[in-house]
Amino acid sequence: MIKRVHLGQGRADEILDLPNLIEIQLNSYEKFLQLDKLKSKKPLLNEGLESVFRNIFPIKSGNGDVALEYERYYIENDALNFTEKECKRKGQSYEAVLKVRLNLQFLTTGEIRQKDVYMGTIPLMTERGTFIINGAERVVVSQIHRSPGVVFYKEKDLYSARIIPYRGSWLEFEIDSKKDYLYVKIDRKKRILITLFLRALGFDTREKIIETFYNIKKIKVEDGTKRDLPGQYLAKSINIRENMYYRAGDKITLQDVEDFLQNGVNEIELVDFDGYNDISGKRFVSSNVILNCLEKEDAFFALKDGSKELPKESVMLAVYGSLFPGEPISIDNAENDLKTIFFSERRYDLGRVGRYKLSKKFGFDDLTTSVLTMDDIVNTISHLLRIYEGHDILDDIDHLGNRRVRSVGELLTNIYKGAMSRVEKIAKDRMSNKEVFNLKPQELISVKPIVSAVKEFFATSQLSQFMDQVNPLAELTHKRRLNALGPGGLSRDRAGFEVRDVHYTHYGRMCPIETPEGPNIGLIVSLATYSRVNDYGFLETPYRKVVNGVVTDQLEYLSAIDEEKKCIAQANAAFNSNGKYLEDLVSVRISGDYTTTSPTNIDYMDVSPRQLISVSSALIPFLEHNDANRALMGSNMQRQAVPLLFPKPPIVGTGMESVVAKDSGVVVKAKRSGEVILATSSKIVVKPFEAENAKDLDEYHIVKYERTNQDTCFNQSVLVKEGQKVERGEIIADGPATRYGELALGNNLLLGVIPWNGFNYEDAILISDRIVKEDLYTSIHIKEFSIEVRETKLGPEKVTGDIPNVSEKILNKLDENGIIRIGTYVKPGDILVGKVTPKSEGDITPEFRLLTSIFGEKAKDVKNNSLKVPHGTEGTVIDVQRITKEDVGNLSPGVEEILKVYVAKKRKLKEGDKMAGRHGNKGVVAKILPVEDMPYLADGTPLDICLNPLGVPSRMNIGQLMESQLGLAGKYLGESYNVPVFESATNEQIQEKLKTAGFNPTSKEILYDGYTGEPFENEVMVGVIYMLKLHHLVDDKMHARSTGPYSLVSQQPLGGKAQFGGQRLGEMEVWALEAYGAAHTLQELLTVKSDDMSGRVKIYENIVKGVPTNVSGIPESFNVLMQELRGLGLDLSIYDDAGNQVPLTEKEEELINKS
């Protein structure tokens, strides 16, 4: 390990160590599968896969005679066909068999038949938090989606409340503020008046509705109160006699008051709009929206004579008709249907989260009921009305209390739920069969829906992604990513600015910096360093508890909901050894506001300054001195750094380098403390101190030169020697892009910030050829080429070195089986695997047919279908793999074997490669200068790299300058530094180090021109900067074509390197050539080099013959245009200067020749 000097303003030690950075994946999958509990035979919790089975079973037959009951499930780990390594090599999935113990119970006879039923295979997660599917490592990204529960919001003039379940119908309430009416919508269908909806749910009288929402006051009817009563609303109906009935909700008139007095009504109950009940302490509604809705009912329904309430039939017709238009209605069925939509566990599920959110909102303790209750509906309506009245506030949809995370375990649980409901349906159908008494449990279960659903999820789901494996940081970040897209999430086109924007609740939970540039900005984000997901799926972040102004060591994890209105101090607030704050006023944040307050008001304190950013951003030293846009680019570009052959850790680090290396899974860590008894390049054997016997040894296999998903090289190197003692968790072998157990993505280079003859104009980079000679930025890239050997209708294909019409020189590189030898250097067009395919009879010439009939099968002609090295690829063959049916057992139909050839290429840094620092300072290598021509320091040390000073002021990423200054001191003092984010070294500390190293405190030095030896006019800033080589290499982009494939319709060359295409000459390029007057160049570009079919054949002929040429015919695109115009019914013909018709098609040519 490297000894680092802590240099910064804060404390070197932190109260809380960083958690395992991939625990979001590991914990979620463990909750889903409960493998640890299965191994230790402990009872399983009702979550994940166990909850799916418990919810579906028992499955009962229609008549109730037969029941299929669930006991438990097993994962057959011993039955794993292949190890992780073999799965990758053979293109298989790393999965185990899932079996479920079922009891088939015959209730009439009491007989029970038990069986362990096969339920398909289930992919297993590797220790690194990945899955291996068809030989490729994949990651299931966590999804951030709208939380189930209730949310209140406003759109234009509509105040809305929405109850979102985990599964089931959406219920929306909306108040039309122009008309003062409240409506309800179920599943976004037609609006229903709220009073009708309430009546359908059982509030069948006006009185019930009014007393549910309004406070009621009793008033004595006397001459004195006579004037105050008109205009008020009755809360209870008054029935004086047959023709004198006053309904609840009716407005009282002066005449009504007179009638009350005359008929001896001494006391009446009225609606009290005060909205607060002094006795119960309960808040009621204070607007007349509900009363308006009761009035509106009367306008819709003409009541029958003498009826005092709406008949049930009318209510059900109105409600059910809006929900299911055109369906015949039976009143009882309609009532049941309406209730099952929300109150049946089969059709509706709020989920644990939905119930938690509702209870939290309305102050209940109930956390078990999974369906809606009448109280939920009433409370939602009351709360919405209070918001409308201005007594309560709207919800913030982008608040992290209203968004939750679905990790891999929950996503898979949902997949299994959907598949098992189909299995249940099939089982019930089979139970209805007359022969049910002869059945066994396994005959009732159909595995197909489960197998196909799981396969589809891992292979095609938007959230199951091919792992980004460029370097360890890219892997780690991919596993910690949160995605708002995907099934049940947002769509790129409809996501507005608000959803993408940074919100104050993201603090300590989601990184405000790391997100892609482009259409996904803000929709794909990263977890903050200390963040974790709680049981309900909400993101939590840790805080230190502050009691009476004293900081304690007690830690609490708070979700965004818990944190609301709490007073939180920053991590760098100064306090003494007793935990008392040193200042009278401390900077704090309360919800989204930043202010200062007295220490006694503080509730919590941040645990670390890097708490609010992601792992990638926390690797950028002096982050606080960079503009946010450049920090974003720096975070993203570190993930694109190619692992180098000889990387070095940065001189100026942040302390996160070792954590990332440890948790990324690319290094080898000791499982137990012990002594190394064997250390070779491919294997380490450790004898543990607590070994029970001589055979109890820990073996570690070292990975050598394997290909990653992105064609970079995965290579581990041993760090320990035989006889060395190692501790548990110690790193004993480095992986790609790690050195001495620290992340090492690039190298430290001596930098001069100086323009140099225009070669570093516009972000271009000038480098010394010392970098190339010493292989500082040399990387290995491994490509895989594969070919299938099939059984065809005409006979099997063969792998052979006996290939027709191929020169001996090319075949020399193949072995006796026709496969390239390992160690051979191959170039484009070389054969890697010789393969011949039988030709069909139609392809055979008459002479061959004669030979076949004389000599039989021996003379059968074959076609050369060999695997060749594609254009633009060369390198050394490092491995060949042959996978046969015997090896795997389930190759695709018709495939006999698969051959894979791995070609490795050492790529040195060259002009056109992209490089970048950690501060978003990216550029392309424009020139590699001989070391003797580079500017040099007074002691003769030549610079390694020259960057343009104009790249700093407008980009505002000053961090790169501070890093360079401290790096310079570190290089000459032989020190490495930890400069934590947001607590980085001050200018004074850097200058002190520079002075100690013998440099000018400004780090400006006199530089000498490498050409002339003369000093430059001004002093130049010199430093040591950490630069990375990015995965945008010129070798992958450079491309040339002479002839190649053409598009079928337009006959123009295809586009792009992958299609071996041409270079597009667009509209503006044509203008440029026109403006220049290059008529002949333009003509040949638009005709013979593009789509003039006859012209290009002639010109090729003439070039071969060496004859000067100037031919051009009609471009094919002109013919396409002509045919389109003819398709519109326009008869067009073309004539040349002599007046002869020019044929456009072969048919036309025949007709012209005939005439």
Swiss-Prot record:
It catalyses: RNA(n) + a ribonucleoside 5'-triphosphate = RNA(n+1) + diphosphate. The keyword Nuclease does not apply. Keywords: DNA-directed RNA polymerase, Nucleotidyltransferase, Transcription, Transferase. GO terms for cellular component: DNA-directed RNA polymerase complex. The keyword Transcription applies. One of its GO terms (biological process) is DNA-templated transcription. GO terms for molecular function: DNA binding; DNA-directed RNA polymerase activity; ribonucleoside binding. The RNAP catalytic core consists of 2 alpha, 1 beta, 1 beta' and 1 omega subunit. When a sigma factor is associated with the core the holoenzyme is formed, which can initiate transcription. Belongs to the RNA polymerase beta chain family. This is DNA-directed RNA polymerase subunit beta. It comes from Borreliella burgdorferi (strain ATCC 35210 / DSM 4680 / CIP 102532 / B31) (Borrelia burgdorferi). The gene is rpoB.
